[in-house]
Amino acid sequence: MLRRAASIASEASVRRVEVDRVLDERSVRSASRRDFIGRISLAAAATTVAPALVAGKSGGSPTRVVVIGAGLAGLTCAYRLKQAGVNATIYEANSRLGGRCWTRRGDFAEGQIAEHGGELIDQGHTAIRQLAQELRLPLDNQLAAEPNGTETFFHFGGAAYSYPAAVDDLKGIWQKVHRDLSESGYPTLYNRSTARGAQLDQMSISDRINESVPGGIDSRLGRLLDVAYNIEYGAECDQQSALSLLYLLGYNSPGQFNLFGASNEKYRVRGGNDQIVTALAVSLASQIVTGTALVAARRNAAGTYTVTFQNGRRTFDVTADKVVLALPFSILNHSVDLTRAGFSNLKMTAIRELAMGANSKLNVQFSRRHWNALGNNGDTFADTGYQATWEVTRGHAGTAGILVDYTGGNIANTFGSGTPASRAAQFLAQVEPVLPGLSATWNGRATIDFWPGNAFSRGSYSYWKVGQYTRFAGIEGAQDGNAHFCGEHTSIDAQGYLEGAVETGERAAGEVIADVNG
């Protein structure tokens, strides 16, 4: 997302056009190019390429490919492999497919739905948008569904903090932010950095706010940025590299204030994001093994891998020519013996040290969308204790509406205790100063998703701590021998997004195909 945001903003500036226009044009160009490549690739697979891939380089035994992890990344990878004539076996520890792409159904009145995990899709997220189109799954435009005249509410220091006031405050740090962006360059990686980029990587977001914002982190703008980037990455801002703030906030235009730069969170899949998972799984059904967890990986002398799985009390080995690891590093580090995997020292450093954010989602349903009557679109940020909200039901039928209280870091970690009802009551007391009268419209329905307690992810999504851009960023997705890696945690541009899963799943599939056919 970040690299794409950088180039989009740069093109818009040079051409003196709106960012949305550039996004739309790129989507059309990308779709046309992808359609062309898809037709050529599938035609080749149907004639000369597929037999070569199935038979392997030498024309002998088929290449044995194993994909470990049946989340969105692993399923996308296996789906693209199958289209190219490579039938991988997919192993998943959970009994459910999809990982963090998982829709809530049946919990709310009027048939309304919510997402357990990944929810919003940017306009620039072309990989997942094109996959959804290929699977004939329409997307709903969340921004177009917002009632005219509604806007985001900020509430800090005991009072409303208006959008014009926030824009004025941002103007005060504009030159500093853009000078940092220019001098840092994008991206900053373990093998690519400038002096300023390396310097900022050694600072935290909190440090940079205190240095650049008048009044520091105790000012209204400072508090807003602290809350926004806490929930964005699921960690306290004093733990995160300052570059994570710069590479989003830096892509605003003069007089504009988008907290997350070019990220506009415009779409979601109509009827639930996990329909992508379902559609992929139908195509791959005979290849998927569930309830089977990876416990060890060993690189053999011939370059093959022996991977050890556990299914209940049974442990067994599988030998593969190619292994795609499509599960979070938090799981690899915690649950898998990699002492004989033969990975590079830098890869092992990333596996051990890449941080996993803590985010929780409290979805609360109301009998009507009272926030719209107040002039609010459902998006709020505040320092009253709940952190942030957005409306889950934009574009949904019915009079009821759902707000999600989205928390990160220390606050998110507290959601491992309490009931949905008690947490909803707490939230309503905290949000009442921002949306007065809301409490009276709660219909008694609420759900909690506590991602730090999820045994299959051990957190919400990845982020880089102070110093980690220059320490190992960029190695996460790099091929290591005959091992390939995918998942949002291996994406530079779309870390933390469903897009990151799809984009890297396709990348890993491309690597395998190139090697097998090479």
Language model region names:
Residues 1-32:
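N-terminal secretory signal peptides
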Residues 20, 189-296, 311, 319, ...:
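Active-site/ligand-binding neighborhood in enzyme catalytic cores
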Residues 29, 34-57:
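N-terminal export signals
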